[in-house]
């Protein structure tokens, strides 16, 4: 570890405080500021779930769903899926036969529940715009063990990406989420024209699967960036400025939330694919930037 270690004793306790040279302190603060600059644009894109993605759900997404797709709009079905995911995770992680048996029973019960729910489907299910807000927290819970398994396997092989690289990958994944939205929007009317078409009864709508898939991708990007970013700040921040640097992370998040309005400014008379294209561009430029300074970030990490 760079720098000197200063020890102070108080009774039987010994506290070690890392002392950095002015040069090391400066390098770490600069590295953190570079990360803050990047995450601003991630949160700007990610928090479109409360703005343009909700507009899209309200104005361009089908108002009903049938068949297997409709099961995603029942919270109990989502809970069953979570039980299956964690049951599988436990099944492969357990070292005793009893634990594996319990995990297997949980999985079978959840599958039986889903099978029963599917057989009981009758007609269509209404789909309102606010219901799409359930998918981000659902995917956070469901994907956490998946991401742990992936990076655990990479770590055992000595190939796990560093925290700064995960942040860059998170930006690329976020870009992929809005690329999905671009594909879903080709051929659609502008929001203003869609509003007129809805009033005239001639509007066309897209499948809810587009938004569900986008939330899936964006949530995986969040799992790459958010916990890794906080961990990076905690690890790299100079001891004297740790609180300030952690505050800087939340300031960057707040600025990103404020900038979500940029997409709303062009929502109206612009083709939808251009709106999503702006967000794709922001994420890609941010990813290119963080990979261009990766050596500086990994040096202090």
Q: How would you describe each model-predicted region?
A:
Residues 19-28, 125, 129, 203, ...:
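Membrane-helix interfacial "entry" motifs
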Residues 35-44, 49, 131-234, 239-295:
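Membrane-embedded alpha-helical bundles of multi-pass transporters/translocases
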Residues 1-124, 147, 151-157, 297-301:
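Intracellular loop-helix junctions on the cytosolic face of multi-pass helical membrane proteins
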């Amino acid at each position: 570890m760079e720098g000197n270690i200063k020890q102070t004793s108080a009774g039987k306790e010994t506290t070690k405080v890392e002392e950095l040279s002015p040069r090391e302190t400066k390098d770490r603060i600069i590295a953190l500021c570079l990360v803050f600059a990047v995450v601003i644009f991630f949160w700007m894109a990610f928090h479109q779930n409360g703005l343009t993605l909700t507009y899209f759900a309200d104005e361009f997404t089908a108002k009903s769903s049938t068949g297997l797709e409709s099961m995603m709009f029942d919270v109990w079905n989502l809970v069953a899926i979570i039980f299956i995911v964690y049951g599988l995770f436990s099944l492969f992680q357990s070292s005793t036969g009893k634990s594996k048996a319990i995990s297997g029973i949980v999985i079978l019960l959840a599958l039986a529940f889903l099978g029963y729910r599917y057989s009981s489907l009758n007609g269509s299910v209404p789909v309102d715009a606010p219901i799409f807000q359930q998918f981000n927290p659902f995917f956070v819970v469901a994907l956490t063990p998946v991401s742990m398994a992936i990076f655990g396997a990479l770590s055992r092989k000595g190939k796990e990406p560093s925290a700064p690289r995960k942040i860059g990958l998170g930006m690329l994944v976020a870009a992929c989420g809005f690329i999905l939205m671009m594909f879903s929007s080709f051929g659609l009317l502008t929001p203003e024209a869609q509003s007129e078409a809805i009033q005239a009864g001639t509007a066309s709508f897209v499948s809810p699967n587009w938004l569900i898939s986008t939330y899936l991708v964006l949530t995986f990007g969040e799992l790459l960036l958010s916990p890794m970013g906080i961990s990076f700040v905690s690890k790299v921040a100079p001891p004297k400025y740790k609180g300030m640097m952690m505050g800087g992370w939340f300031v960057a998040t707040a600025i990103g939330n404020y900038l979500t309005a940029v997409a709303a400014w062009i929502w109206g008379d612009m083709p939808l694919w251009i709106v999503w294209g702006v967000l794709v561009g922001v994420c890609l430029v941010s990813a290119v930037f963080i990979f261009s300074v990766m050596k500086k970030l990994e040096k202090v990490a």
